Swiss-Prot record:
This is Fluoride-specific ion channel FluC. It is found in: Cell inner membrane. GO terms for molecular function: fluoride channel activity; metal ion binding. It comes from Shewanella sp. (strain W3-18-1). Belongs to the fluoride channel Fluc/FEX (TC 1.A.43) family. PANTHER family: FLUORIDE EXPORT PROTEIN 1-RELATED. GO terms for biological process: cellular detoxification of fluoride. It catalyses: fluoride(in) = fluoride(out). Its main location: membrane. It holds the Pfam family CRCB. It is a multi-pass membrane protein.
Length: 124
């Protein structure tokens, strides 16, 4: 039951962060490209790599994994919004932005998970 509450707490924090980051990105770059979703996915991917690496080396408790990995990062990142925004770009006929969105999300997020893991593994 404790882990469920930790996931809920982390999720509420992650959802608020996602909302604030998305609003900020729209204010800075406008809404013609889903930069907010890209940024939260990239940030979340980096920290997921860190959490995974720490977990592999038993330097993080199951409770902290639940709070940060499942709760906070699960709510911060969003595959469903990424998918919806990509589909909307396709429906609007903006194939270039849709393809760019897919390529950037996948390549940057994979790289950031790797970078987060390597940062931890190289320091310990």
């Amino acid at each position: 039951m404790t882990n469920v509450l930790l996931v809920a707490l982390g999720g509420s924090i992650g959802a608020v962060f996602r909302y604030l980051i998305s609003i900020f990105m729209i204010q800075v770059f406008g809404s013609s490209f889903p930069f907010g979703t890209l940024v939260v996915n990239v940030i979340g991917s980096f920290f997921m790599g860190v959490i995974y690496a720490l977990g592999q080396m038993s330097h993080i408790s199951p409770e902290l994994k639940a709070l940060i990995g499942v709760g906070l990062l699960g709510a911060l990142t969003t595959f469903s919004t990424f998918s919806n925004e990509t589909l909307l770009l396709l429906q609007e006929g903006d194939w270039l932005k849709a393809i760019l969105n897919v390529v950037l999300n996948l390549s940057l997020c994979l790289f950031m998970v790797y970078l987060g893991q390597q940062l931890v593994f190289s320091r310990i």
